[in-house]
Structure formats: C-alpha cells, structure tokens
Amino acid sequence: MARKKASLDFEQSLADLQALVERLENGELSLEESLAAFEQGIALTRDCQGALAQAEQKVQILLERDGELAAQPFDAEPEA
C-alpha cells in the first residue's frame, strides 16, 4: 500500500502543480496571490523532484548471471 500512496502523492502533487501553472498563466491573480501560488509551486516542484530521485534510486535492472539474479543500477542512457 505504501507504494500506491507514494505514487498517488506524486500524481496529486503533479496535478496541483499543473493547476497552479494554469492559474498563473491565466493572469487573473493579484500580485500577492501570484507570489503565494509561485511559492506553493516551488514547494510542489521540490516534492516531485524528491519523489523522482527516490524512484530513480530504487530502479534496478535484474540480470541473470550464472543462474542467479543480480541487481544492476539503472542506466538511463542506452549504450552506443
């Protein structure tokens, strides 16, 4: 259940961030409201970046070697 909760938290943070961006782009907020929305957006961005960093650390590729499964860190760039 913890995995689903973390995923939902990330998804909710991302949705909230998108809504904030739309409100800011709309241009109908006062200066104070815009600053508050911007501050909230920065916090949400940091939360999302942290969640992505944690997920990246957890991602591992399982390789079969000599009949055993060995964990190898995920490499985002394919080998040339």
UniProtKB/Swiss-Prot annotation:
GO molecular function: exodeoxyribonuclease VII activity
Top-level division of the source organism's lineage: Bacteria
Transmembrane segments: none
Annotated keywords: Cytoplasm, Exonuclease, Hydrolase, Nuclease
Highest classification ranks of the organism: Bacteria, Pseudomonadati, Pseudomonadota, Gammaproteobacteria, Pseudomonadales
E.C. number(s) listed in UniProt: 3.1.11.6
Location(s) in or outside the cell: Cytoplasm
Catalysed reaction, written as an equation: Exonucleolytic cleavage in either 5'- to 3'- or 3'- to 5'-direction to yield nucleoside 5'-phosphates
Entries under Pfam families matching the protein: Exonuc_VII_S (PF02609)
Chief location of this protein within or outside the cell: cytoplasm
Stated family: Belongs to the XseB family.
Quaternary structure (record): Heterooligomer composed of large and small subunits.
Protein's name in the database: Exodeoxyribonuclease 7 small subunit
Described purpose of this protein according to its UniProt entry: Bidirectionally degrades single-stranded DNA into large acid-insoluble oligonucleotides, which are then degraded further into small acid-soluble oligonucleotides.
Keyword check for Nuclease: yes
GO cellular component terms attached to this protein's record: cytosol; exodeoxyribonuclease VII complex
